[in-house]
Amino acid sequence: MTTLNPEPRTLNPAFPLRNRLWYFGFFCLVIVAGLASRRFGPILPKVIAAYAGDTLWALMVFLGFGMLWPKRSTLWLAVMAAGFSYLIEFSQIYHAPWIDAIRQNRLGGLVLGRGFLWSDLVCYSIGILIGFGLETIWSKMRANHHNSP
């Protein structure tokens, strides 16, 4: 027997339903913020100017992975984003003419970086934790909203 009013669908906070359009919007905002942190670095507090770009880059990676894999868990996204970000950073230890030529290009430098820094790994961790934390909070709020009478 079917019912006219089925139980409302509940969301599992471990597997949030990500809206790719929203994530794309946030992705673009983070890119703009990252570029602005470089452009306006001289007038920003030194700690922001020094670390915001790398922190926002990792948040952008987290959001990008969320767009690509909207049904994966938040933890999975964080682990994959961290692995990708750390791999890019450790790749900066390797120097060959072909990859250094790519790094000299503005876009290549933004994506691949130019030199290995331990502080970048800390920034990546913070950026991904920000994404993880915001998505976890959002998922719980959304689940509570959908489960309320």
Please report, for each region that a protein language model flagged, where it lies by residue.
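Bulky hydrophobic segments
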Residues: 2-142
